[in-house]
Amino acid sequence: MASKFLFAKSFATTALLAVVLALAIGFVKPGFTNDSQDKKVTIENIPTYKLELTRSSVMIQKSWNYLLSKINSISSSKLRAQVLSMYQNTAPTFMALYQTDKSKRTVYEKLLNEGLIDANTVSKENLFPELKKLTIIPQPFFTAPGGSLNEHHYYPGGLVVSTAINVKATIAALYAYKDLYDYVDLYDEAVAGQLLQACAKPFIYQWQDDFEVTEDYLIAGAKASQVIGLSESIFRNLPVNVIIAQACAGIPLLSAHDEKTIVKAIKAAAIIAGRDPIALGLLSFDGESLPTPHHQSWYVVGQSSHNEALATYAQKQAIEALKEVFIKTYGMKTSDLKDKKVQTFKNYIGSQYSFMRIHS
């Protein structure tokens, strides 16, 4: 059951309204202590359990509380509940459509016939990551990384931190518009779209026994984590403009080429969700462009979703620096750097201290 990944202990002093909302609909926060702080630990005693790493991190705690508070700030009660539900249940509900080999083959062939998938890189068997049961989440939102080893926020809880930074950027843009243009009518669409932009990563990036994660792949020229997330939002009947804003998070709407890429991602997502994107209003009547007029929220989410550029660079540089530490300080060989102990150490540094701080 999904509840076994969640903890009933909550903060009385942080994000109080978010906690009240969460408890009201059955969602509870992982248990932290109010005096959480960075603690010294020997390399032999580094925690390996993902929830243990995330529960002990001040950075992840702050990010998680922030996300809950911003979910609670959404004025629409229906949308607020939908977003919170997707944070609680990271098992894609649309997977109910794909419980047989025949159903998986059918959707795979549809994507293939529409030119939305490359048979050389993605097979029918690998179209969806493993999901043992619809009622068991692949992992909590809370433990997922923000990306793979060669991307960004690659540590347990990285998704929470990455999403929090992007949401902060989105809200900062909205406040700037309020201050300078004297309006902020985009709040619900933009904040919800940004909160959901990486909602499929707990499904896509599943931690393995060797402390690596399953890799992302491409659907319709976009990352599968983005397309799968859009499929889930479509299947759960989220508002059209929230879904399009979510689509623009990974592919900013800067040119006609970008729009074509977003359209392809939405087409693929709708096929997977078993819905008609034109009938839903996600695409124009000819299915070749986004509906007009464009909503400003789409652009706001797109322009505030690029923390990954710096985070990816910082992570790569930090990991290279850590390799030198392993070799010079601990006497390891290059061939030892894939050892579980090394992977555990990198996860610990990322979650407790951050690669950004190492790089700075």
Spell out what each predicted region is.
Residues 6, 65-69, 81, 85, ...:
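Polar/charged alpha-helical tracts
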Residues 38-214:
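Acidic/His-rich, divalent-metal-binding segments that scaffold phosphate/diphosphate chemistry
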